[in-house]
Amino acid sequence: MITISDTAQAHFVKLLADQPEGTHIRVFVISPGTAQAECGVSYCPPDAAEADDVELPFNGFSAMVDEKSAPFLDDASIDFVTDQLGSQLTLKAPNAKMRKVSGDAPLVERIEYIIQSEINPQLASHGGNIMLVEITEAGVAVLQFGGGCNGCSQVDITLKDGIEKQLLDMFPTELTGVRDVTEHEHGEHSYA
C-alpha cells in the first residue's frame, strides 16, 4: 500500500523518539477521491488509533491508515530527501484524487483513470487539462483540451508525441489512435 524509503523510516524513528512511547505515524487523505484531495502525515498517539485502522509495520514504528483513506493510498510513497537547500519529506499518492481502477474495468474507466492520475497532473503545470469525450467504435479516444492547452501552439506535439504515445503504449490492443475535437482559440489563457 505505502512504500516508505529507508531514509524516511530513519527520519520517522528519530522524530518518534521524542514522542510518548507507543506513538506511531498516521498517513491520511483529506477529501479522498476529489480534485481537492490532500495527503498528510501526523503523529498517532496510542490512544488515537481506531479499531478499523490499517496498521502497516515498518522498522521501529507503524504507519496507521484510516479505513476511508486506505484505497486512495495504494501505490503511495514517502521519501526524505536532502539537497543543498535542506531536507524535506515528500509524500506522493497518485491515487488520492481518484481511486485506482481494476485491470478488468471498462476501457473508458481505465483511460479516464490514466488521464486524471498521470496525464492531467503533467498538463496542470501549464494550466491545462484534457477530458475524454468518447471512444469510437474504431478504437479512437476522442479528447478535448482545456485551460492553458486550449489554443496552445504546442498542442499537436503534446497530443501526438505525448498523450497518444502514452495511451497507445498502455492500451495497444484496445486503442487505435487519439483525436482532438477542441475548437482551439489562442488567447491570454493559452500556455504558448
Swiss-Prot record:
Stored Pfam families: Fe-S_biosyn (PF01521), NifU (PF01106)
Cofactor note: Binds 1 [4Fe-4S] cluster per subunit. The cluster is presumably bound at the interface of two monomers.
S-S pairs: none
PANTHER family recorded: FE_S BIOGENESIS PROTEIN NFUA (PTHR11178:SF51), IRON-SULFUR CLUSTER SCAFFOLD PROTEIN NFU-RELATED (PTHR11178)
Name of this protein: Fe/S biogenesis protein NfuA
Organism: Shewanella frigidimarina (strain NCIMB 400)
GO biological process entries: iron-sulfur cluster assembly; protein maturation
Keyword check for Lipid biosynthesis: no
Binding site for [4Fe-4S] cluster: C149, C152
Domain of life: Bacteria
Cofactors demanded by this protein: [4Fe-4S] cluster
Family of this protein: Belongs to the NfuA family.
